[in-house]
């Protein structure tokens, strides 16, 4: 199946992790923050990136709305960003996950 959007990719990634156990742990979270903006948390336990570190990446961090930052902590991928940056954060995660070496 062609993955047309970033959200399509994330939904398919989530489904590919579901093994009868993984999905019963702490699942992916997408929330709003009061800046305004988005917060993304994706668990890595049991995935191809389990135990891997992602060096913090920030884009336009001082901008009021057009900013985001992504990092790993406690075996989770995190992103936080402005109100129009959710897809960008998911794309950073997608690039990192699909670049497994």
Feature annotation, model-predicted:
Residues 18-58:
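Amphipathic, interaction-prone secondary-structure segments
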């Amino acid at each position: 199946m062609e993955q047309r959007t970033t959200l399509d990719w994330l939904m398919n990634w989530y489904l590919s992790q579901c093994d009868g156990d993984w999905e019963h742990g702490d699942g992916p979270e997408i929330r709003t923050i009061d800046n305004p903006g988005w917060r993304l948390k994706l668990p890595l336990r049991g995935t191809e990136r389990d135990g891997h570190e992602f060096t913090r990446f920030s884009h336009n961090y001082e901008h009021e709305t057009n900013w985001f930052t992504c990092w790993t902590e406690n075996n989770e991928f995190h992103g936080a960003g402005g109100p129009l940056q959710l897809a960008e954060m998911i794309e950073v995660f997608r690039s990192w996950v699909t670049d497994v070496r």
